[in-house]
């Protein structure tokens, strides 16, 4: 069983029977880490809606914390922090993390922990902006598909992927492209800018109702049976 708490925007707190994971925190209430569980804190890149130095306050609250941060984030010399470039694998006795190059900034994470496989895209997405330069659009789309191909052999339990309403009618392409290549049991749309009706629109227009875990309120908690 996975316990998933939606914090804000692209930030989630995930609890397994042994481990807690915090992704892309910048604001909101962070759930308490149960005694005896290790906490891993991820930041996919330095953008203000995905990263805040406030995450380092957690070291004062918990003894067993490790930070896995994209290498574009300003460096701090601390043994509890690992800075990860794209296309590497980090592992310790509890966790294995594969990284992928974002077509925006930083990295995406594939996390294998306690028998679960979780994908957090950060800002890796099909950013098919209407009216944008075609050469740039082709570049970002090709890079997105290149990175998806690297993930296709994973059996993912939960994938956290942007569903950004600012892309207008192209809002869904990041998820639909992902589903054509990768295998996931559940999808969690994120990066919705509090316009959660885009999730219902996705289900109505694209389907996948049984795969979508819809978080529409900050602080919402869902127990997910895998």
What function would you assign to each model-found segment?
Residues 1-33, 107-132:
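Conserved beta-strand hairpin/beta-sheet module of binuclear metal-dependent hydrolase folds
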Residues 4-9, 78-92, 103-105, 171-226:
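Binuclear metal-ion centers of metallo-dependent hydrolases, dominated by the metallo-beta-lactamase
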Residues 10, 25-27, 45-46, 72, ...:
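Active-site metal-binding loops of divalent metal-dependent hydrolases
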Residues 14, 24, 45, 97, ...:
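Divalent metal-coordination and catalytic microenvironments
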Residues 19-21, 40, 66, 116-118, ...:
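Structural motif
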Residues 27-74, 149-160:
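Active-site metal-binding motif and surrounding structural segment of the metallo-beta-lactamase
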Residues 61-88, 95:
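Glycine/small-residue-rich loop that forms an oxyanion/phosphate-binding "nest" at active or ligand-binding sites
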Residues 103-180:
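Active-site-proximal loop/helix segments of hydrolase catalytic cores
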